[in-house]
A protein has these predicted regions:
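Oxidoreductase cofactor-interface core, primarily capturing Rossmann-like NAD(P)-dependent enzymes
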Residues: 1-15, 25-26
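C-terminal substrate-binding subdomain of Rossmann-fold SDR/epimerase-dehydratase oxidoreductases
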Residues: 17-20, 25-131
Length: 131
């Protein structure tokens, strides 16, 4: 996702290395930090396990490309899957179950798919190239 945005912000074409339907769990960095701090602050008595999954959303590569082109209408994004990289993505789960974290220490992400891109990633990457 960041590579797509960086290329779009620089008016460069981007060839995505996975299929459009490739899906992976995703979260904004502020939510990752929030999860670490939330787990560290949780009362030990509330924790039912030592390891927790946390997630926010699971977009496909096509979902990400659509979001990027909605913000950068001249973006040129194509899909040219590379077998080795596609196999890595295919070996990962498309979604992560974070229900135990939600139950034990009230985990919930602040950033939705749209907010991650429109309020966090895209503005920060645009600002980087505006310098």
């Amino acid at each position: 996702a960041p590579e797509m945005i960086h290329n779009a912000a620089q008016h460069k074409p981007y060839a995505c290395f996975v299929r459009p339907d490739a899906t992976i769990p995703f979260m904004a960095m502020p939510d990752a930090v929030k999860a670490l701090l939330g787990l560290a602050a949780a009362p030990l008595s509330a924790l039912t396990q030592r390891v927790y999954n946390v997630t926010s959303f699971s977009p496909s590569a096509a979902n990400i490309a659509e979001m990027v082109t909605s913000e950068f209408p001249d973006a040129q994004i194509t899909f040219e899957p590379q077998q080795q990289r596609q196999e890595i993505i295919d070996s990962w789960p498309a979604e992560v179950d974070d229900s135990q974290a939600r139950k034990d220490w009230n985990w919930h992400p602040d950033y939705s798919f749209t907010a991650t891109f429109k309020d966090y990633l895209i503005p920060n990457i645009r600002a980087h190239y505006a310098k």
